[in-house]
């Protein structure tokens, strides 16, 4: 996947994980599962509020100038988005603000550890190149999205099962 030393950032619908790998072995693991603000679920809720799909949210975001979404709680952030819509802010700017907000939340978790030179993005958001781009900016390093990254956990489990049955 990424050689012997890397950080894997897995952003799924329910949680976000940062996994540090040294010499091919997991050395450290962080997870945010207490709040949906840094997950795909947050993006799904905000996309619904804007009346678009997640794919359309990223398309809009790539065309906008990010507005600040200050709330860390999904419910309060949703209220902020509703207010911005009412104020006539563009969907592009709101979408960009939403994506930047999630990327910052993920970056805050990742910054709790010293990241090696190679950072791999897995989970459902690995299929969104714009998210990897924004996360790269937030972390000030290159974040590469894994091909078929949404299946990384399942692929790893299958490889482990195959190894155990040999």
Features from the language model and the residues they span:
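Gly/Thr-rich phosphate-binding beta-strand-loop-beta motif of the actin/hexokinase/Hsp70
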Residues: 5-24
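Short, surface-exposed connector motifs at secondary-structure boundaries
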Residues: 2, 25, 90, 112-118, ...
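Glycine-rich phosphate-binding/hydrolytic loop that grips phosphoryl groups
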Residues: 1-2, 40-44, 146-166
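Active-site nucleophile and cofactor-binding loops and adjacent substrate-binding regions
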Residues: 9-13, 31-38, 97-99, 125, ...
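Glycine-rich phosphate-binding loop plus the immediately following alpha-helix
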Residues: 5, 23-69, 159
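Adenine-nucleotide phosphate-binding core of ATP-dependent small-molecule kinases
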Residues: 77-111, 150
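Glycine-rich phosphate-binding loops at beta-strand->alpha-helix junctions
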Residues: 110-138, 149-153
């Amino acid at each position: 996947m990424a050689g012997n030393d890397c950080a894997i950032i897995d952003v799924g619908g329910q949680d976000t994980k940062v996994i540090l790998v040294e010499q091919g072995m997991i050395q450290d693991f962080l997870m945010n599962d207490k709040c949906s603000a840094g997950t795909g679920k947050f993006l799904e809720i905000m996309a619904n509020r804007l009346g678009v799909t997640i794919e359309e949210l990223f398309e809009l975001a790539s065309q906008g100038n990010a507005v600040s979404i200050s709330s860390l709680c999904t419910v309060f952030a949703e209220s902020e988005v509703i207010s911005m819509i009412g104020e006539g802010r563009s969907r592009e700017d709101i979408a960009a603000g939403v994506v930047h907000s999630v990327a910052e939340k993920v970056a805050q978790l990742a910054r709790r550890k010293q990241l090696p030179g190679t950072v791999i993005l897995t989970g459902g958001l690995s299929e969104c190149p714009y998210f990897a781009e924004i996360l790269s900016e937030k972390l000030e390093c290159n974040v590469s999205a894994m091909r078929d990254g949404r299946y990384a956990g399942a692929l790893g489990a299958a490889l482990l099962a195959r190894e155990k049955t040999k």
